[in-house]
Amino acid sequence: MFNKVTKTFQYGQHTVTLETGEIARQASGAVLVSIEDTVVLATVVARKDAKPGQDFFPLTVDYVEKTYAAGRIPGGFFKREGRPSEKETLTSRLIDRPIRPLFPEGYLNEVQIIIHVMSVNPEIDPDIAAMIGASAALSVSGIPFAGPLGAARVGYIDGQYILNPTATQLKTSQMDLVVAGTEAAVLMVESEAQQLSEEVMLGAVVFGHDQMKAVIDAIHDLVRDGGKPEVQWAPPAKNEALIARVAHFAEEKLRAAYQTKDKQARTAKLKDAFAEVNAEVAAEATSVGGAAPDTSEVGNILFDLEAKIVRSQILDGEPRIDGRDTRTVRPITIRTGVLPRTHGSALFTRGETQALVIATLGTARDEQKIDALMGEYSDRFMLHYNMPPFATGETGRVGTPKRREIGHGRLAKRALIAALPAPEDFSYSVRLVSEITESNGSSSMASVCGGCLALMDAGVPMQAHVAGIAMGLIKDGGKFAVLSDILGDEDHLGDMDFKVAGTANGITALQMDIKIQGITKEIMQVALAQAKEGRIHILGEMEKAVPSGTTGELSDFAPRLITIKINPEKIRDVIGKGGAVIRALTEETGTQIDISDEGVVTIASVDAAAGQEAKRRIEELTASVEVGKVYEGTVLKLLDFGAIVQVMPGKDGLLHISQIANERVNAVADYLKEGQQVRVKVLETDDRGRLKLSMKAALAEDNPEAAPQE
């Protein structure tokens, strides 16, 4: 009944199993991938033909985590999985990016890839299994696809590269890098690092690419034994006559438009040129009795012509679209403290790209609690990236962040997290929001620069300035050019775009997307060296605006955090019965108080005086009474045989009638009254913490001559 095919191979320290032919047989392709108890099912379905009039490739990738994979039932009223988590969105993008360039040009049939996480080992992140599964499912499906694709995670511990490190190993790794590619070329890199050099980062890319050959070989074997016949598909024939006529009408117009340096003016000229060319081509066709060509077909030809013009100009050494050479970074302006009531803010402008970044400080209660499939955890640093449509002079939907915004926010967060102070040095939780107010390329890297400056403005003691730069690469045969600080137009016309962020000491985040084969290690080396040059220039501009070591003062509107350590056994004294003591403390002082199991008390208050008052009262509550020490006490209650005296809040003891005075005391009321302040010495304390007090002993200590003579 089943034509099940299984392939197993060793991949680093893990055994990987690929299975096809048993599950999801009606999909175009389906592969079950297992890595040490982490199991994913990857399926792909392609439509038999393209929708009429469609002029783009509709590829969708959905990575879906099921809570049953971790042996849990979802929370909430409906007890079902909800909308995609940030992790699911980011992993979907991670799979999409290296796969998309491997479909042939002109293939417009809808393709849907769905990856379900069926079982998860908390030590093995499912993302690598998902990437391998998507590649294998496409390969066995027979769909036109220039794969297979391999994927690997690379760590860096004690100067050694680690292939597919576990979650435990990643905690001590200086790098978390994911690389994907075919047998011939690297196609995608996504990484964060602890300020590592370009050489170490490139070495990790090459190491990962070499190791993933094991994956590619296993998929080839799987296709040989369990693959479906190749789908017969041929790219649509190019209308060479139409291409020639469009080029005849459009080339000069497009070249003229690309002499305009301002983005909005250039966009307007290009729009006019497109309209004129469409009209001229249509008029020529109808004048000879033919039908006007499809406008989308003309548009695609114009796009190809645009790319050819811009690319050839750059490769011939001519100025770029905005007049720069290949290495120059656009003019940078920086302003901090932009918004009066926020905790920190910075306006970072680079050419026609601008980010207004706001920092907000909070307490441990403000940390983001994340119920992840691999285990629940809290995150003290959040970064949210928003790009409204007005940033590009357009109208559009405003609302839930799209995949692109989530991805850009995650990249900026990766870049900054390595330079944040340790929690023990700065116990605040931090939220950064990057509002992109103008965009013409490299907005995620503007978020990195603006984010670092906003954090410094908020008083966060950053380890160093962090800057980011977006780079491009254009290659034609043996000629290539690396572009620093790319524009939006250069982004989609190039063969490789990559973003590098870091400090003067090294890289903290690296993202690469390569659209063609033939990008060698040497080319990547040149590109990374030029990116470093650009990053150092931007760091210099940031240093001028906010010199190192000049972290801003905390805003008057930010909470002040006071941290004290108490004996864990005293925690109950601060909390009180049913939380009565701590509730009264927070209400009376207007502060927020958090106590860890280890006895670390964090007091948060916008009013510094209120925070100090809360600290004083907690210290009183947790202070230990010392035997043999004299205290100023308050008489709380008179008894027939003595009095109850409070020596400090929550600490009272018995002053026996025999210890009130040197002479005989017949009535306690003759010597004491409730509320009276008296000096008492602590004689002893029993195992239940009860105190025995003495006024006589205190008097003798204050005035030895008054002590009774033996």
Curated annotation (Swiss-Prot):
This is Polyribonucleotide nucleotidyltransferase. Residues 559-618 form the KH domain. The keyword Magnesium applies. It catalyses: RNA(n+1) + phosphate = RNA(n) + a ribonucleoside 5'-diphosphate. It comes from Herminiimonas arsenicoxydans. Keywords: Cytoplasm, Magnesium, Metal-binding, Nucleotidyltransferase, RNA-binding, Transferase. Its cofactor is Mg(2+). Residues 628-696 form the S1 motif domain. One of its GO terms (biological process) is mRNA catabolic process. It is found in: Cytoplasm.
